[in-house]
């Protein structure tokens, strides 16, 4: 993947400005509420029976934060994202058996949450760079499924 200097700067700036403890739980909660079939991977996380239960679930919040910290790996390894996610790809494909389509769903939910937080600063150019980055990460996470 080729990254322009502008794309790199935008991605680094977005992640530097995110409150992971706010954005991570909101993005994962949104995914589990909007796409309820994704809840099947979180059976050990307790009550997921209602949107309020999901949004108030501390295990969901903690995992959402963990996901955002996992994206730091991509930000720090933009020239080698596929290799940076090999371990996580193996974990999600071989151990957790996560449907790789769910990575895209979560990326879409993250985009919505980040856009809502950034407001007018989430310009089309910003969205372009952000979604390009997430698409590369999603592809890297799914590479072990092939």
From Swiss-Prot:
Transmembrane segments: none annotated. It holds the Pfam family Globin. Heme b binds at residues 63, 92. It comes from the Eukaryota. Signal peptide: none annotated. InterPro entries: Globin, Globin-like_sf, Globin/Proto, Hemoglobin_b, Hemoglobin_oxygen_transport. Red blood cells. Residues 2-146 form the Globin domain. GO terms for biological process: hydrogen peroxide catabolic process. Belongs to the globin family. Hb1 is a heterotetramer of two alpha-1 chains and two beta-1 chains; Hb2 is a heterotetramer of two alpha-2 chains and two beta-1 chains. Involved in oxygen transport from gills to the various peripheral tissues. Hb1 and Hb2 display a low, effector-enhanced Bohr effect and no Root effect. PANTHER family: HEMOGLOBIN FAMILY MEMBER (PTHR11442), HEMOGLOBIN SUBUNIT EPSILON (PTHR11442:SF7). This is Hemoglobin subunit beta-1. The lineage of its organism: Eukaryota, Metazoa, Chordata, Craniata, Vertebrata.
């Amino acid at each position: 993947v080729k990254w322009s200097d502008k794309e790199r700067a935008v991605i680094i700036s977005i992640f530097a400005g995110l409150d992971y403890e706010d954005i991570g739980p909101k993005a994962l909660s949104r995914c589990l509420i909007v796409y309820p079939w994704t809840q099947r991977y979180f059976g050990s996380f307790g009550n997921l029976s209602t949107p309020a239960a999901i949004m108030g679930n501390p295990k969901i919040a903690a995992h959402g934060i963990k996901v955002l910290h996992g994206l730091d790996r991509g930000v720090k390894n933009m020239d080698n994202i596929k290799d940076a996610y090999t371990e996580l790809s193996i974990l999600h494909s071989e151990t957790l058996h996560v449907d790789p389509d769910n990575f895209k769903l979560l990326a879409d939910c993250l985009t919505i949450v980040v856009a809502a937080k950034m407001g007018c600063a989430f310009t089309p150019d910003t969205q372009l760079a952000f979604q390009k980055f997430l698409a590369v990460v999603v592809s890297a996470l799914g590479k072990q499924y092939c």
